[in-house]
Regions:
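Short beta-strand elements in bilobed, periplasmic/extracellular small-molecule ligand-binding domains
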Residues: 89-100, 204-227
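An alpha-beta-alpha
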Residues: 170-212, 320-334
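Periplasmic-binding protein-like
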Residues: 119-127, 185-187, 219, 240-250, ...
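N-terminal helix-turn-helix DNA-binding module of bacterial transcription factors
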Residues: 1-63
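Hydrophobic alpha-helical segments within soluble ligand-binding/sensing domains
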Residues: 160-186, 201-205, 226-236, 254, ...
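N-terminal helix-turn-helix/winged-helix DNA-binding helices
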Residues: 2-7, 45-83, 91-94, 114-117
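Flexible loop/hinge segments that line or gate small-molecule binding clefts
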Residues: 103, 125-170, 212, 252, ...
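Flexible loop/turn connectors
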Residues: 215, 234-342
Length: 342
């Protein structure tokens, strides 16, 4: 027997407020207190409440325009995803409107309002921030939203297309162990980023099983940049840390670490191995040749768009999708332990 969907009246009853207050909260009314807003969002997530979008879809003709919010346009990873998404949309006769925004930023709601104001049919958000569920909650009854990224495990009801980040972390640990490394660093952890956190957890778990020790150097910023990698790299070498391998949270961080290694006259990979994640175009250049993981941007773009188009159909876009495994790309920055091991 099918379970009857929860209604806005039931959410209002549990929150001890009126239906109008719940509606105003979900629509982002600034007059609702933060305490009440948090409680209503919690109840909606807990009970799977989501307004029926069918009426909106049937009453408004589709524009053929898709919105996409990129977390960081300065990051080549997102630029490459944007290109792949635009190509996928073009093949379907669709256009894409891009803007930049981070779920934890104060102006994030303005980005969604901007896209809605331009009558996009739906939105793809590239983000793995823990703040995503709360940031999009006021809008999920107004427009379909698909997340290209990793969400907290408890948020399984949000349409998402995600990488198998934990398996990538495990694979990284096994690879470095196979080369002979027993002491490693996870460089640039952002604990608010669910994708990176899962990579770290997979790396840490596999390393523990293999008997490897792992040191963690945390990224204090909201984005993963070469500047962060450079500063963490300088700290690593200045403190004379003895780990023989580094798994960087992103290729940008890895490239910054590589610059610091050269400044300290440390050879990669002869003295220390370096493994990245993202396979940005710069990682393949002849003077870098970074060993890394490819997140398969074309596949992510295709599946994100397909999921969004499914969400535009009555009853579509429900259920979880299989995780997409990244592809390991071996180049020239990892080798068996060298001088540092000696």
């Amino acid at each position: 027997m099918a379970v009857k969907p929860i209604t806005i009246k039931e959410i209002a009853r549990m929150a001890h407020v009126s239906c109008a207050t719940v509606s105003r909260t979900l629509n982002g009314d600034p007059g609702v207190s933060q305490e009440l807003r948090t409680e209503i969002f919690r109840l909606c997530r807990q009970h799977g409440y989501r307004k029926n979008l069918v009426a909106r879809r049937l009453s408004a003709a589709r524009s053929g325009l898709i919105g996409c919010i990129l977390s960081d346009m300065n990051n080549p990873l997102f630029a490459e995803f944007a290109l792949a998404l635009e190509e996928a949309a073009h093949r379907r006769g669709l256009q894409v409107m891009f803007c930049q925004g981070q779920a934890e930023a104060p102006d994030f709601s303005k980005k969604l309002e901007f896209l809605i104001g331009h009558r996009v049919d739906g939105v793809i958000l590239t983000s793995s921030s823990r703040q995503v569920p709360e940031a999009i909650a006021p809008y999920t009854d107004r427009i379909p939203i698909v997340i290209q990224g990793t969400l907290p495990p408890e948020e399984g009801g949000i349409p998402a297309v995600s990488l198998d980040c934990a398996e990538a972390g495990r694979q990284a640990a096994r690879y470095l162990y196979g080369l002979g490394h027993r002491r490693a660093v996870f460089l640039g952890l952002r604990e608010n980023n669910c994708a990176m956190l899962q990579r770290y957890q997979g790396f840490q778990a596999a390393a523990e099983e293999l008997g490897m020790s792992v040191r963690t150097l945390v990224n204090p910023e909201r984005t993963s940049t070469a500047a962060v990698g450079y500063q963490l790299g300088r700290r690593f070498f200045f403190d004379n840390l003895t780990e023989t391998a580094v798994f960087a949270g992103s290729d940008n961080v890895a490239l910054g670490f590589l610059a610091a290694a050269r400044e300290f006259c440390v050879s990669v990979p002869d003295e220390i191995s370096l493994l990245g994640f993202d396979n940005i175009s710069h990682a393949a250049m002849h003077h870098v040749r970074l060993t890394t993981f490819d997140p398969r941007n074309r596949t992510l773009a295709e599946q994100s768009l397909e999921r969004l188009l499914q969400c535009l159909e009555p009853g579509g876009g429900l259920g979880e999708m299989p995780l997409i495994p990244p592809i390991f790309v071996e180049r020239a920055t990892c080798a068996p332990p060298g001088l540092r091991e000696a």
